[in-house]
Amino acid sequence: AYHTLPAPVLALFAGLLTKVGVYAVLKATTDMLPGAMTPWLSEALGWVAAATMLMGVLGAAYHWDMRRILAFHIVSQIGYILLAIALGGDAGQAATLFYTLHHIVVKANLFLVAALIWRATGSYDLRRIGGLYAAQPALALLFLVPALSLVGIPPLSGFWAKLLVLQEALAQGRVAWTVVALAVSVLTLYSMMKIWMQAFWKPHPDPQWRPDTSARVAPGWVACLVLAAITLAIGLNPQWLIDYSQAAALQLGRLP
């Protein structure tokens, strides 16, 4: 149902409300039920996370509606966060918090950029649009920042978010989970490049098409620029957010 909501509401829901369940799981296994993350629960949650990542990214790769693609990527990226929770310990919890904060910004930005694409072309269907790179190159750049961050390309925030998760997974000998996470990143790149190629690179199906510049989209542009700047700022200087996440993780499970 996410793909049917108005763009501002959709961006808010995708960025924030999808994290409520994740926060509940994290709190339940730390403050509310200390010691609840037993080895068998960690194992089960890790495989659930791997399956979630795969199912989400395969759904994204299949669809042509930008909203559906991005909605399925919510599922996939929640899988990464669940994997960090499954890894447990201070490092896993710090990775959980860092990934969550990064994803709030990136996912909200992607849905807002998709709305700008819809404003310019009149459709979310990738098969019915095109030519935006030539018509609006700034919009193309604005899409690439959150898209490549979602994939985990440096020097963007998503690179550090995934690095924290994968480092801890390898440190615990979870090779299978690491392989799944890397494979999902490749499929994420495929689906983001599908949007790029179809919406921006290929010519528009209608040779007479011109982008709609009459709509008042300035607030949307400002919001996307701010979110993109945050993504880039975290990517170029991640240590402050890593330190914050580690400090916050140390408090989990230690509250009275």
Specify the residue positions occupied by each region the protein language model found:
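Hydrophobic transmembrane alpha-helices and their helix-loop junctions in integral membrane proteins
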Residues: A1-L163, Q167-L189, M193
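Cytoplasmic/organellar membrane-interface segments at the starts of transmembrane helices
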Residues: L5, L126-R127, A134-L139, M192-P256
